[in-house]
Amino acid sequence: TAFHRVIEKAINEQVDFVIISGDIFDLEDRSIRAQVRFKNELTRLINANIGVFICFGNHDFVSNRKSDFNFHEQVVIFGPQPEQKKFHTQAGVDVYLYGFSYDTRHVVDRKIEQYEKGEEEGFHIGILHGQLESNKEHDTYAPFTIQELVDKEMDYWALGHIHKRQVLHMDPPIIYPGNIQGRHKNEQG
């Protein structure tokens, strides 16, 4: 599968961590088989000492039932409010990741207003499953403007929600990575 290939690449490249910025599943009511495959791939990352940070999005939001099984304790899942998590790389660099997970299908609040970059030395990454406010092609979820992201002074923004690869800004990088596997013929993957 496409996800298996991404995990294989991460292991081969010996990356420090992987960020999943939402919509790993297409629906909240995901199959047990899909969840088991997902968990198995995450276990491969953990076994390779690669960190995993997940923000669930509008397609795979985490309701009160959380999940049909527990994730490995080393898999970091962001809660429903923006929060900071720390990761220490093997090279000795402190990385601070900021994000939140959807706890309902429709998050229309301006969650970006709740992101607060810490004062710690290190690399700061914002993770946001949301939509550029000016984009009227999709329903608006967790809207933001490019200027709002720039003003947060993160070193990088890992975005989710839009399934098409887009570079919104270069300094700092504000990136929609797109999806790794198209859901239909109109999505490239």
Give the location of each predicted region.
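His/Asp/Glu-rich metal-coordinating catalytic cores
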Residues: 17, 30-189
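N-terminal active-site segment of His-dependent metallophosphoesterases
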Residues: 1-35
